[in-house]
């Protein structure tokens, strides 16, 4: 049963006004500064979000408790963002300062990159369950597709050497777009009126999309995303001002919500096939990377990747329609 229409709309339209527009621009500017600061300062990227957990009494007993974390999803979201983000900060410190010790060495191990991968998977899965709970099964299917197409670790993730120790993930432009439109559709119908923040979600997703483009480093998308989301969740948890300063409650339309999910699903299906083909042929090594990251990778590993791609093409060419090798391939 579709329940978002009854849960997400108070019945009082909230038109887009100049106050909403200015509030969104100011929020975007604040998010931009936070993302840029966190990207270049590994230590604060751990301590700020770790200490933010100490505000939890306000989540439970504060003046905004009735308009903040009022359902299981919001509680799961804030905890699955702040706690892991603190550990990601420790990973960056371990790489930036090259500290000694077993724990620091573990945090620097490339295989530990499976941790942020798993957290991203978890965050998408949480929203996917919420989509299914509210009745938008099309958009829930998109969430599942996004989980399945997160680029693998540590092949397409790394913490770059240097004092900034940036966490980068080589996601594709199509994946970023699908994630953005899926998340917006989810936020459009996934929250009750006292907790709604669709306009604010537009801000955090817009900054995550635009920041890497301005920096001409597409691999910073995940990093920008992980540092915009906790800001949103903390505001909601402590005192949710979004329904007042940038109201969007009355924007909801049930038909738009469902059609939006269907369109997202239609875009996801071909991407799943393309993503699988990229991995199978070895083209993902190059095509998932863009800009300078691709140039650097090709310069270091281009010959090896070409050999892998040639091997994949030759294996496809020497197999008959029944999957058996031809005579020439067995000599």
Where are the predicted features?
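Hydrophobic alpha-helical transmembrane segments and adjacent interfacial helices
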Residues: 50-67, 88-91, 116-132, 173-189, ...
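Generic multipass alpha-helical transmembrane bundles of integral membrane proteins
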Residues: 102-219, 225
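Transmembrane-helix bundle segments that line or gate the permeation/cavity pathway
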Residues: 16-36, 48-96
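Hydrophobic cores of alpha-helical transmembrane segments in multi-pass inner/ER membrane proteins
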Residues: 21-31, 77-95, 115-123, 142-155, ...
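Short, strongly hydrophobic alpha-helical membrane anchors
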Residues: 1-17
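Long, low-complexity, intrinsically disordered segments
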Residues: 311-331
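Non-cytosolic membrane-interface motifs at loop->transmembrane helix junctions
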Residues: 68-76, 133-140, 250-260
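C-terminal transmembrane-bundle signature of multipass membrane proteins
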Residues: 24-33, 197-317
């Amino acid at each position: 049963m579709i329940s978002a229409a009854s849960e997400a709309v108070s019945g009082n339209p909230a038109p887009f006004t100049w106050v909403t527009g200015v509030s969104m621009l100011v929020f975007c500017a604040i998010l931009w500064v936070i993302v840029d600061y966190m990207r270049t300062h590994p230590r604060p990227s751990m301590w700020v979000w770790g200490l933010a957990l100490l505000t939890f009494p306000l989540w439970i007993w504060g003046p905004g408790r009735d308009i903040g974390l009022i359902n299981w999803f919001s509680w799961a979201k804030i905890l699955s963002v702040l706690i892991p983000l603190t550990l990601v900060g420790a990973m960056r410190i371990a790489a930036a300062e090259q500290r000694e010790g077993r724990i620091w060495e573990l945090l620097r191990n490339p295989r530990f990159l499976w941790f942020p991968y798993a957290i991203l998977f978890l965050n998408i899965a949480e929203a996917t369950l919420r989509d299914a709970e509210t009745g938008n099964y099309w958009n829930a299917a998109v969430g599942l597709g996004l989980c399945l197409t997160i680029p693998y670790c540590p092949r397409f993730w790394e913490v770059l050497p240097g004092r900034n120790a940036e966490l980068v993930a080589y996601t594709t432009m199509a994946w970023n777009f699908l994630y953005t439109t899926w998340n917006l559709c989810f936020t459009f119908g996934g929250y009750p009126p006292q907790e709604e923040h669709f306009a604010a979600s537009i801000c955090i997703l817009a900054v995550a999309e635009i920041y890497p483009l301005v920096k001409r480093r597409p691999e910073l998308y995940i990093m920008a995303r992980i540092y915009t989301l906790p800001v949103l969740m903390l505001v909601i948890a402590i005192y949710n001002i979004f329904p007042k300063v940038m109201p969007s409650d009355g924007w909801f339309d049930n038909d738009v919500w469902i059609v939006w999910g269907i369109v997202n699903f239609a875009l996801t299906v071909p991407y799943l096939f393309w993503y699988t083909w990229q991995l199978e042929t070895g083209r993902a090594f190059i095509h998932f990377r863009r800009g300078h990251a691709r140039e650097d990778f090709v310069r270091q590993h281009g010959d090896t990747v070409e050999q892998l791609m040639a091997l994949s093409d030759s294996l496809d060419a020497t197999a008959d329609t029944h999957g058996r090798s031809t005579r020439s391939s067995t000599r």
